[in-house]
Amino acid sequence: MEIRAAEISAILKQQIATFGTEAEVAEVGQVLSVGDGIARVHGLDKVQAGEMVEFPGGIKGMALNLETDNVGVVIFGDDRNIKEGDVVKRTGSIVDVPVGKGLLGRVVDALGNPIDGKGPIEAASRQRVDVKAPGIIPRKSVHEPMSTGIKAVDALIPIGRGQRELVIGDRQTGKTAILVDTIINQKRWHDANDEKAKLFCIYVAVGQKRSTVAQIVKTLTDYGAMDYTIVVAATASEPAPLQFIAPYAGCTMGEYFRDNGMHALIIYDDLSKQAVAYRQMSLLLRRPPGREAYPGDVFYLHSRLLERAAKMGDAAGAGSLTALPVIETQANDVSAYIPTNVISITDGQIFLETELFYKGIRPAVNVGLSVSRVGSAAQIKAMKQVAGSIKLELAQYREMAAFAQFASDLDPATQKLLARGARLTELLKQPQFSPMATEEEVISIYAGVKGYLDKIDVRQVGRFESSLLSEIKSKAPEILTAIATEKQISAQTEEKLKAFLDAFSKTFA
């Protein structure tokens, strides 16, 4: 073998010329103890609160407790591979997630990493997870409707764009069903391709079973709703820090649409589980417990999240972010700590009851306890025209329902009231996955409050409604179009509608 001195020296010269003197500088600390998703780290003197840190093997964590001699870090992942003495690096960045339209149709984890096997995400940019809510000046009062396609909600508890409306009830009362229907209902605006009316949806699943999340994704895909939806999943098997951060991550993704003049809807399903995850983290970090062992700042945990939902003024692009948080109660106890907190933060609540659900009244909305504090300003005039009287009649019916058992002894006026109430209650029932267009809801409720159902057997109300709507679509679509475009029932439209209903009632059998 021949040794060429000239060649060797040329290679050595080249190596020396390209030798980089710049060493990689990182501030590091050492793990003192680890367990239950929490690591105590010594060092990291300059770490910021909420900063991302990196453990060996690429596992990320977030610095939450900054104490005199150590830092309490919550671990976003499996802590079994982290051991005492491991080196922890500062990343210099606060926790952030990808945002943009590239996320639509995807399922991501709490840190924005795709978990649906469809390849990497093309994000517009990355934004911080925990940012301040918009101030008072850039906001505008809620004035545009956010249609859910559910008669009971759109008529009695209307929701506007930029509103925060709580959905509260025991387990298995149909909370998620209402929310999934709301997402599916937005398809009609996406199909119409009206950019101003489109509503992008974000569904944040916190602490739910993986099978449940998979089922929801499948349902949304089947109905073509995944095209405008992002699903953020932090399931029950994920560590508490990921369940805690997921709602904020989803909210940041929604804020991208709000701040770019678009409209978004975010669903947190559910915040009780986020509060439980936060309680677990806080207790393990040895923060002092308060009522029901929740930490003292659990109110702030939810208020800073829900205050980020807003309707922006014209100067700020006129976008909006509507929030529908979910709270699960135990035995219909609305006066527990977390439910009362969230009720006081939101602009109203939809209260679902087990008893109604088992009676077959679905959606099981308790109309008496449910309110919408700002939604009436967003309701279209046509719905206001018919919904005013249905509220009153249902309230009177609930008051009188206690006497319904002694129906034979009641005067005709009360009997009539009870009969009307029973039919209106039947009219507000709606099967799952069949949201209605606003103009159809208006016609359906109009028929109820104007007495067209009074002579019909209660069991036939559903059939009457479906026949009426299919008949009106085929024979008098101009009535539907008039209500949809004018957003009110004008005198001419009402005349046509009355004539149509009179004729239809005679033929219905």
From Swiss-Prot:
Keywords on record: ATP synthesis, ATP-binding, Cell inner membrane, Cell membrane, CF(1), Hydrogen ion transport, Ion transport, Membrane, Nucleotide-binding, Translocase, Transport
Binding positions (ATP): 169-176
Any single GO CC term annotated in Swiss-Prot or TrEMBL for this entry: plasma membrane
Disulfide bond sites: none
Short name of one Pfam family: ATP-synt_ab_N
InterPro entries assigned to the protein according to its UniProt record, in alphabetical order: ATP_synth_asu-like_sf, ATP_synth_asu_C, ATP_synth_asu_C_sf, ATP_synth_F1_a_nt-bd_dom, ATP_synth_F1_asu, ATPase_a/bsu_AS, ATPase_F1/V1/A1_a/bsu_N, ATPase_F1/V1/A1_a/bsu_N_sf
Reactions catalysed, as given in the entry: ATP + H2O + 4 H(+)(in) = ADP + phosphate + 5 H(+)(out)
Gene Ontology molecular functions: ADP binding; ATP binding; proton-transporting ATP synthase activity, rotational mechanism
Source taxon at top rank: Bacteria
Entry annotated with the keyword Thylakoid: no
Main location class: membrane
Subcellular location: Cell inner membrane
Gene3D superfamilies: 2.40.30.20, ATP synthase alpha/beta chain, C-terminal domain, P-loop containing nucleotide triphosphate hydrolases
CDD domains: ATP-synt_F1_alpha_C, ATP-synt_F1_alpha_N, F1-ATPase_alpha_CD
PROSITE patterns for this protein: ATPASE_ALPHA_BETA
The enzyme's E.C. designation: 7.1.2.2
Annotated site, Required for activity, chain positions: 370
Membrane topology (UniProt): Peripheral membrane protein
Subunit structure: F-type ATPases have 2 components, CF(1) - the catalytic core - and CF(0) - the membrane proton channel. CF(1) has five subunits: alpha(3), beta(3), gamma(1), delta(1), epsilon(1). CF(0) has three main subunits: a(1), b(2) and c(9-12). The alpha and beta chains form an alternating ring which encloses part of the gamma chain. CF(1) is attached to CF(0) by a central stalk formed by the gamma and epsilon chains, while a peripheral stalk is formed by the delta and b chains.
Functional description taken from the UniProt entry: Produces ATP from ADP in the presence of a proton gradient across the membrane. The alpha chain is a regulatory subunit.
Recorded family membership: Belongs to the ATPase alpha/beta chains family.
Protein name: ATP synthase subunit alpha
Species annotation: Paramagnetospirillum magneticum (strain ATCC 700264 / AMB-1)
Phylogenetic placement of the source organism: Bacteria, Pseudomonadati, Pseudomonadota, Alphaproteobacteria, Rhodospirillales
